[in-house]
From Swiss-Prot:
Family statement drawn from the similarity comment of this UniProt entry: Belongs to the metallo-dependent hydrolases superfamily. Adenine deaminase family.
Protein name: Adenine deaminase
Origin species: Chelativorans sp. (strain BNC1)
Pfam entry (one): Amidohydro_1
Keywords: Hydrolase, Manganese
One Gene Ontology MF term: adenine deaminase activity
Catalytic class of the enzyme: hydrolase
InterPro entries on file: Adenine_deam, Adenine_deam_C, Amidohydro-rel, Metal-dep_hydrolase_composite, Metal_Hydrolase
EC number: 3.5.4.2
Listed HAMAP family: Adenine_deamin (MF_01518)
Domain of life, per lineage: Bacteria
Cofactor(s) required, per the database record: Mn(2+)
Length: 600
């Protein structure tokens, strides 16, 4: 186990007398960062000519330049650079990055993020409580401060609509809160329709958190649901996609986490939602920024620091944007006394920024872990001693020996309920297409821009459930693509133009015990193996990033119209309008299954 963890810094309650002595000059600090400008997230000002005194991994004081006259402290000269608090990401899913918590920490620290709040519902959907607790153990050994928002919607809907590996009941969630101190909130309550309609299971889960004084995170689409959602105790959401619903949510007392992501992905809603501030005049005091989902490649390129700079581009002052990226997330979860600012007693989680507000150095608990944009030997050693997941996590893809992945060709005129994909890939259209009698599927593909899609149950909980569907506008012209990260139940989703290539893709994932792949002419052209729960790699984030880059190249060659992370969302049966799970095609507004074909 690494000695560079959240627990390396003692609790403030055990350090107050010592820190008071250091701040008063009666004791020497361990480290003094001199020659700095300081970004205060409390007053939202940049203060010139300051030095930061650090002892025992905590800030003793921020003082005027030249205050330190001792001789025992290590001196770091910031040379006029800007010191700011480490960033705090209030909503992420580590599993989306396809790396473990320890590996995730490497990318986060390179980007100046020192604290994250993780909803581990992905691994919970595969391995139930055992998966959540394995990730908590992983997080405890990581060189980062990782808190849990307990998964609230596992499965995302109901056993009638999909088969998940996990089933986190109110009783299991209550037990997680009672056992794990770092379980600080209830994770995003995605089944917002059920919450609004008063579903008994959903409200029992809400009660498990509220009875213990834990805040509830949300996930809601549609202004018509906001009032009931807020009345049910939900007090934050990251799903505000435009200024109108953002304004509704603020007025309902719900914190906003503005989600930023690469514009080619489904996660870049910040530019529209931030207009509640820049156009409608709302205060930014209950608004933070978050990343939500990143793959390993994008995690290195588009961290929370990038999202914070996007807020600046959208009209926020740098001091405001950095507060939204640090103090506000900490405040939402009641941890502003420990992180999010440079006040006395806070953890010494700091970043040195260049003039473009890009992190150059990162200190975690007073230890220099990133210097000149490269990890230090101290961090490299910590990252080399990663947590080993339980053996059961490496055996979660359980498929029948034979499964048919394509539907029978209709012999009569029918109406097909197809799934229309559109950029960026979050919402999917329900498109009814009339298919005339034909002897070949290729005729329908050419005429209507279709391809096959199937979802195969992989948890070993059914007799080999497989559902068939048709994608329109996906633009896959040949071959197949497949993923074991089919949100949120994480069954295997396969799309293709022919049964043979789809079978190759399915079996490649089975052999690797998880992954994302592209197949052309019977050969796997790209593969990201994900052997831990079918979701995570056991490699360093930089290695996984290279595998993801290669996958993206082949994905683009295949012609797919949405990125693979959008493809992974196709089974997510809580986002309109139509989805496919292992049980069939789900009409989301009605929460019911419809057959692929009906008589014309």
């Amino acid at each position: 186990m690494s000695t560079l963890t959240r627990f390396s810094v003692r609790p403030l309650a055990t350090m107050t007398r010592h820190l008071a002595d250091v701040a008063s000059g009666r004791a020497e600090p361990d480290l003094v960062i001199k020659g700095a400008r300081v970004l205060s997230t409390y007053s939202e000002r940049i203060l010139p000519d300051r030095e930061v005194w650090i002892s025992g991994g905590r800030i003793a004081a921020v003082k005027p330049a030249g205050s330190y006259r001792g001789s025992a402290a290590t001196i770091y000269d910031a040379a006029g650079g800007l010191i700011a608090p480490g960033l705090v990401d209030p909503h992420i899913h580590i599993e989306s990055s396809m790396v473990t918590a320890c590996s995730y920490a490497e990318a986060a620290l390179l980007n100046g993020t020192t604290t994250i709040f993780c909803d581990s519902h992905e691994i919970g959907n595969v391995m139930d409580v055992a998966g959540v607790e394995a990730m908590l153990e992983d997080a405890r050994q990581a060189p980062s401060s990782i808190f849990l928002t307990v998964p609230s919607t596992v499965p995302a809907t109901s056993p009638e609509l999909e088969t998940a590996g996990g089933d986190l009941t109110a009783e299991k969630i209550a037990a997680l809160f009672d056992k794990w101190p770092e379980a600080v909130a209830l994770g995003e309550k995605m089944d917002f329709v059920q919450v609004a309609m008063g579903d008994e299971r959903s409200h029992a889960i809400l009660a498990a958190a509220l009875e213990r004084g834990r805040p509830v995170s949300g996930h809601v689409y549609g202004r018509e649901f906001v009032a009931a959602y807020a009345a049910s105790g939900v007090t934050d959401t990251h799903e505000a996609i435009d200024r109108e619903i953002a304004d509704d949510l603020l007025e309902a007392g719900i914190w906003l986490f503005l989600r930023g992501g690469p514009p080619t992905t489904p996660w870049h809603s910040l530019p529209q939602a931030i207009k509640t501030i820049t156009e409608l005049g709302a205060s930014h005091k209950r608004i933070a920024v978050c990343t939500d989902d990143r793959d390993a490649d994008d995690l290195l390129l588009f961290g929370l620091d990038w999202v914070t700079r996007e807020a600046m581009k959208a009209g926020m002052k740098p001091e405001q944007a950095w507060a939204m990226g640090s103090l506000h997330g900490a405040t939402r979860f009641g941890l502003e006394g420990d992180i999010g600012g440079l006040g006395g007693g806070r953890r010494a989680d700091l970043v040195l920024l260049d003039d473009g507000f890009k992190p150059v150095n990162t200190w975690y608990g007073g230890e220099l872990v990133v210097e000149n944009r490269k990890i230090t030997p101290l961090l490299d050693t910590a990252l080399s001693n990663r947590y080993r997941y339980p053996e059961a996590a490496y055996h979660t893809v359980k498929l029948p020996k034979a499964v048919k992945l394509t539907p029978e060709l209709p012999t009569a005129r029918v109406v097909a309920h197809t799934i229309r994909t559109e950029l960026p890939g979050i919402t999917l259209g329900h498109e009814r297409i009339t298919l005339e009698p034909s002897n070949h599927w290729q005729d329908h593909f050419d005429r209507h821009g279709l391809c096959f899609v199937a979802v195969v149950e992989r948890h070993g909980k059914s007799a080999g459930n497989v559902a068939h569907g048709l994608l329109s506008n996906f633009n896959l012209k040949r071959g197949a693509v497949a993923s074991s990260v089919g949100h949120d139940s994480h069954n295997i989703i396969v799309a293709g133009t022919n049964e043979a290539d789809m079978q190759v893709a399915l079996r490649a994932i089975e052999e690797a015990q998880g992954g994302v792949c592209v197949v052309m002419d019977g050969k796997v052209t790209a593969m990201v193996p994900l052997p831990i729960a079918g979701l995570l790699s056991d490699k360093r984030v930089t290695e996984v990033a290279e595998e993801v880059k290669a996958l993206k190249v082949e994905w683009e060659k295949a012609g797919c119209s949405i990125p693979y992370m959008g493809f992974n969302l196709i089974p997510l049966s809580v986002i309109p309008e139509i989805r496919i799970t292992d049980k069939g095609l789900v009409l989301v507004p009605e929460m019911e299954i419809v057959q692929l074909f009906e008589a014309a």
